[in-house]
């Protein structure tokens, strides 16, 4: 089985799998609906990418792997089935990809990309497959001739149950993606239990409402007791968080916010099973953050422009707390949040929580909902966010942002939130 075709190869998670299998020696091709930064990068790396989908793209392929966004009526998927080509979802393909590896898997509703990437910086002999771009490597995949592999495991489609972890970290088990679990929290929690039970080594946030009751042996982090003297600073506009962990001394990590200390602590406790504490302390300094997580696109004395992937109230609240600290340390005038809601169902379910999350900002700008394939739900957002400015679009002009209604945003800390298209709106072509 040499020729593998990926349908939906432009996705952040599936592109990492494609890159990994290419490094393992397979001949990789892929397709997507439209060109993107990821598809262009893949082409530069030698992957044949076809835009848009067409049934002929799967001719002479031994295996087809498709993303969760691909429907049965997709022309490539349908034709592959007709020709009898083996088709695997991303979830079904994981055992094939991870089968011979010692997997260090990180799961959780929030913080898994950050925790995975910090762990990858600490375990520098491991391959890495995550759903975000590691800034120090410029990729979502690192291939090493090693048995070890750091993997960001996804609970949204229960694919984390196919990751066969040697070591499992769970950052938290807050209810997200419940539609996949029949809207039953108990089913989601049962899946987390299964994920942890498989692992030889388990590291958990023991103050999470569900995880605190986990019965099997595990390494437990109690953030309120174990993380002390958490402080933040800015060096040349770069954010850093310092903290003390248990009796292990002080650590300093790139990024801003208490949640960074929590994610780093979980990674440190996991790495302690394989490395001495001073090696961990030193390697932690190599971590440079991940793209779209408090990602500073421009910074000077008057203006800071930040791109953030936060699309759930819990994430937004934590990131805005970090933003307030940055504003205080840097002496900036105000905070402007630009919010592109992601999925109607998430917005409808968490409307009150979103309103509360944005309470501390000086200005709130709201873009149209990024539907991600969902049918629209009628919502009176102006009643929920009475002080917000609603605009159809926003674009970057130089270091400033200009809204479709003509407003210019040019001072203070400006932060964009969303998992849809907002990142492209905030960035210039070279960012």
UniProtKB/Swiss-Prot annotation:
It is found in: Cytoplasm. Its main location: cytoplasm. GO terms for cellular component: cytoplasm. Disulfide bonds: none annotated. GO terms for molecular function: ATP binding; UDP-N-acetylmuramate-L-alanine ligase activity. GO terms for biological process: cell division; cell wall organization; peptidoglycan biosynthetic process; regulation of cell shape. This is UDP-N-acetylmuramate--L-alanine ligase. It comes from Campylobacter jejuni subsp. jejuni serotype O:23/36 (strain 81-176). The lineage of its organism: Bacteria, Pseudomonadati, Campylobacterota, Epsilonproteobacteria, Campylobacterales.
